[in-house]
């Protein structure tokens, strides 16, 4: 028994522990419940009672030697890890935390939502991947309308039994879904991201944010529409802003108009931004076309309504005097940091 202890002591002394794997192997061989040291302790009961105290002391010393070797290895590995870790100079000044800010387009969209919800409008949303039934058909777009061409719309699939699938070109499909799901009176705004196959320039982009509004009730008139837009424009651009309504055409409204405000840069005198006109377009609007009402299951003889739509990003350009819409989508921190609160 004593010779076995001496042999095991020699094995422990000569065992090389160079990494965590070898340390684990050492523990499994010597110190676990079924290891070599535990095996010798199990044989202690077979030793003569006169020699048992002395052999027990030798076994305890053997166990302590193994545990000490483990502690030394773990301490060595910990010191090496500390030495390899990157040093930290606590005397250096700390880095200032970066103060983020809300994106200018999101600031404008948030203000738009607050203005219209204060007027009694609720917020409705819908899918960006849309069927042409909701994007075109129910909105009174004729089959040969240019907006249905590949040059203007991003089609995902065409010629499917359930209809063409596309990236919505406006948030008007949300209005259609609301009219199909709810009964009048209806008063909603529909903010969201839209997509158009347009050339990218300082004034246009292939993806942008839009907010549209819809109000349907009895005896709604164009005068109600003008009052709503005037109230919005004064809260959005200032009480001294001037507006003008120009006759226009949209398949889903009749009569239709486009709304301009005085140019933010020249104050109406004429400059390169407003193309010497003194005016900048902010939205399109009009009375909901009777065909749209019929397509959505609403009787146009009983109900009337108005709709409007505006580009959130273009409104942000107006408010913050940004001359290139591409800046809103490039995520250049040098530009965005100017809007830090």
Swiss-Prot record:
It comes from the Bacteria. InterPro entries: aa-tRNA-synth_II, aa-tRNA-synth_II/BPL/LPL, Phe-tRNA-synth_IIc_asu, Phe-tRNA_ligase_II_N, Phe_tRNA_ligase_alpha1_bac, Phenylalanyl-tRNA_Synthase, tRNA-bd_arm. Mg(2+) binds at residue 254. The keyword Aminoacyl-tRNA synthetase applies. Its EC number is 6.1.1.20. It catalyses: tRNA(Phe) + L-phenylalanine + ATP = L-phenylalanyl-tRNA(Phe) + AMP + diphosphate + H(+). Transmembrane segments: none annotated. GO terms for cellular component: cytoplasm. Its main location: cytoplasm. GO terms for biological process: phenylalanyl-tRNA aminoacylation. CDD domains: PheRS_alpha_core. One of its GO terms (molecular function) is tRNA binding. HAMAP family: Phe_tRNA_synth_alpha1. This is Phenylalanine--tRNA ligase alpha subunit. The lineage of its organism: Bacteria, Pseudomonadati, Chlorobiota, Chlorobiia, Chlorobiales.
